[in-house]
From Swiss-Prot:
One of its GO terms (cellular component) is Holliday junction helicase complex. The lineage of its organism: Bacteria, Pseudomonadati, Chlamydiota, Chlamydiia, Chlamydiales. Pfam families: HHH_5, RuvA_N. Residues 145-155 are annotated as: Flexible linker. It is found in: Cytoplasm. Its main location: cytoplasm. Residues 155-207 are annotated as: Domain III. Keywords: Cytoplasm, DNA damage, DNA recombination, DNA repair, DNA-binding. It comes from Chlamydia caviae (strain ATCC VR-813 / DSM 19441 / 03DC25 / GPIC) (Chlamydophila caviae). This is Holliday junction branch migration complex subunit RuvA.
Amino acid sequence: MYDYIRGILTYMSSGTLVIECQGLGFNIFAPDRWLIELSGQLHREVVVYTYTVVRETEHVLYGFSSRRERECFRMLISFSGVGPKTGLAILNTFSLSKLCSIARAEDVRAIASVPGIGKKTAEKLMVDLKQKLPDLLPLDSKAIASWESVKPSCMDEGIQALAALGYSKPSAERMIAEAMSELPENASLAEILPIALKKNLQGLNKS
C-alpha cells in the first residue's frame, strides 16, 4: 500500500483529484473540505497521503491531507455500517478537531446529520468514537487555524472555490446563498463552505 504520492495536481472535481507522478495519473477520492484548500495548488506539486481499498475489479485510492486524517478514515470504515463513502462524508462534514469535540460531547445528533448516517448508526458510531477518537486525534490548533482565514468577500471567494471543484457558477451561487442564509452575517468562509457542501449532498440524496 502507498503511504503517500507526491506529484503534480493536474485535475480536480467534486470529491476527486488527479495527481501525475512519473508519467502516471492517479485518480484519488478525497474530502471536499481538503479539495477546497487545494484549489489554489492546481498544476503545482502536492503530497497526498493515500489509503487503498481493494475491490474485485479495481483498486480504489482515497487521499488525505495528513497521516492523522488517513488514520481517522481507516478507523471510521472499520466500524459496522460505515463504508468509504460514508467515511469521506464524515470527514467532509467535520474537521478532525470538531469530530474529536463531538465524540467527547457524545453529540449523536451531529453525527446523524452527516448524509448517509441514520440515528441507529450514529449511536453505534458514537460508542466507538468516544473510546478511540480522543486518543487518536488530540485537539490541534493547526487543524482549526487552517479553516479560519477570512477573506473580503465570502460570497465571491466561496463561488470561486466551488467553481474550482467543477460546480457551475449558477450552482455555486445557489449553494453559497443557501448556506449564508442559515449563518450569521459575519460568518467566515470556513463556516460557509462546509454548510454549502453538506446541503448540496443532502439535496442529491433526496432526489
